[in-house]
Swiss-Prot record:
Organism from which the protein derives: Bacillus subtilis (strain 168)
Binding site residues for substrate: 78, 233-235, 293
EC class of the enzyme, as a word: transferase
Annotated transmembrane regions: none
GO biological process: rhamnose catabolic process
Active-site residues annotated for this sequence: 234 (proton acceptor)
Listed InterPro entries: ATPase_NBD, Carb_kinase_FGGY, FGGY_C, FGGY_Carb_Kinase, FGGY_N, Rhamnulokinase
Listed GO MF terms: ATP binding; glycerol kinase activity; rhamnulokinase activity
Pathway assigned to this chain's UniProt record: Carbohydrate degradation; L-rhamnose degradation; glycerone phosphate from L-rhamnose: step 2/3
Superkingdom in the source lineage: Bacteria
Pfam families recorded: FGGY_C (PF02782), FGGY_N (PF00370)
CC annotations in GO: cytosol
Gene behind this protein: rhaB
Keyword terms of this UniProt record: ATP-binding, Disulfide bond, Kinase, Magnesium, Nucleotide-binding, Rhamnose metabolism, Transferase
Name the UniProt record assigns to this protein: Rhamnulokinase
Amino acid sequence: MIYTAIDVGASSGRIMVGELNEGKLDIQEIHRFANGFSQRDGHCLWDIDHLLKQILQGLQKVKTLGYEHCTVGIDTWAVDYVLLDEKGDRLREAISYRDRRTDHTIDKLEHTLSKAAIYQKTGIQFQPFNTIYQLFEEDRELLKKTDKIMMIPDYLGYCLTGKAVTEITNVSTTQLLNVSTGNLDPELLEAVSVLEQQFAPLTEPGCELGKLRNEWFPDYDLPACKVMTVATHDTASAVIAAPGVNDGWAYISSGTWSLIGVENKTPIITDLALENNYTNERGANNTIRFLKNIIGMWVIQEVKQQLQADYSFQQLAEEAKKTEPFQQFINLNDKRFLNPENMIKEIQHYCRQTRQKIPRTAGELACCIYSNLAIIYAIAIKELETITEKPIEQFHIIGGGARNDFLNQLTADMSGKAVYAGPIEATATGNLLMQMIAAKEVKDIKEARQVVRNSFPIKVFTPKDIDRSTIIQSFQQTVLKALSK
């Protein structure tokens, strides 16, 4: 059986095929394409038609390789959505979570419901771009015309099959799902002026969505596909592919964002979890991904784009190695870095405000970013141990960031934990494995992780002896200084 993963991230997408051979997963990249938002009509908008076109081109390539039949699963980033009318047509283009319309919405909604009340209901961390805040800022007249609100991966599946669902791992990120009941919360829906029936029925990963409607796409020669729901939130798919064993391990799903957390059976909605802004997102097989959403490779992606010389990410890491780490302390989670006009100038301005050495060269900028990511990761690991009351012995970095040896070593040094890097294509791998579990070719997630360990090289980074406590203290003092400006 051939399985196809459609994995669309915030900056790029890829289509991978995979099959299981003697307990090992063989995967092949078939198609890769760019993704990103553009500034149009006063908003940051996604080009959904571009994504659909690329998906169809990729599926056509699958057939060109001789695969007449396959199953398909789709995952994407979280929180963003489309609004559809009764005919199933989009009422407008999908707005990106990086749009500035929700900059102050957390405070606005707090006039209706307190943070504590929302957290007890949802267990979801407070991010200005969460779906609940996007819907709060929606045009009320547009919402009245809306028949269905669909998360991006659900909408892409709908475009291929005509079947509308709301997959649970992605909708859990909206801050509208009640963590206790597993249903959309009526009070939260009312607070943002939407109705429960505007969402399609909730569904779990591993369900058959429907057959690809080839007749809708006469310009493409497509295989006969059965489309499955997978863990449609890309992080939920990636965590399936985290090669952890038993307990005592944490993960960073490292891409445009860094999601750092542990896998639990039950949510943690304590005051300490709220205070530290941790989230309880749904995972596959009724698990809870207790994690923190941290700014990730977005910052270096923006810097790379703005540098005058054409550096690869590997070259930037090599340049960073030539620079002494921990020369600047920057809170990259500050909302000023979410979508600034110029990331390089924003970093330099932060350093100027806090009277630190200003990074100017490509190597200095890269080293500054990677050093501070490592510090932020280390702080989050310590928080996880405190909140969960469990020690973390192993730390798995999965996703694109796993190939960054420089950052991986800094993370090991700052956390004092052994870092295990890989697999790199964790999200697509988890997508494929979820399809295999649904097809009963793989028994469960435990067996899926054994398949990962059998199939992919895992690189180990051991921590060096550094004065990590002093570095973290300096970071925290500088961050407090910046907040007082």
